[in-house]
């Protein structure tokens, strides 16, 4: 496959861009996750970045990508409301994998946000959307711009939620390439990779958490729940970072 020209793709209308990406994705679907990463590093423009929420399976993508580009910037958007175990997990993986961690936060501190808006996560879907815009979307957009990002790796998987079930391996989002190397993996493949490379799940995995975000909008899985029901009171799955703008 030839090197993709981001400027050409961004100049296309949506239908032309979709058609151009379809052929590439047909080939990427038949590659292993490792091959997808190596292909991207060879054919997509630099600088590249990797985003991580340091959730349940985070070690997979972090190891997968940094094994091939060790110094790639790893973007974390820190809301200030993560679980203590998440902060400990971040420290552990940063040391273990020698991550080039870049932490971005909202301009307004958590305490100031609560003073100004109250507890947004208790104010229904609109409150949650504003909370995510302040604490997740704006910091991530700022990170992508400040780091000059042209290619963005992320660890999304289709089996995680209905909103991710049809995502392609490669897309253009926010005028940059976004590659999802493990998009088609199931839980068994995740477990196998972690075991093979001596990596751990997030500490809360053993306590019944399937997905981990902020303390106030994450709950344990119970029988009858889908994974996406454990976040944002079941009102939504995405925080906005991975949604088309």
Swiss-Prot record:
Pathway: Sulfur metabolism; hydrogen sulfide biosynthesis; sulfite from sulfate: step 3/3. It comes from the Bacteria. SUPFAM superfamilies: Adenine nucleotide alpha hydrolases-like. It is an enzyme of class 1 (oxidoreductase). Its main location: cytoplasm. Catalyzes the formation of sulfite from phosphoadenosine 5'-phosphosulfate (PAPS) using thioredoxin as an electron donor. This is Phosphoadenosine 5'-phosphosulfate reductase. It comes from Baumannia cicadellinicola subsp. Homalodisca coagulata. The lineage of its organism: Bacteria, Pseudomonadati, Pseudomonadota, Gammaproteobacteria, Candidatus Palibaumannia.
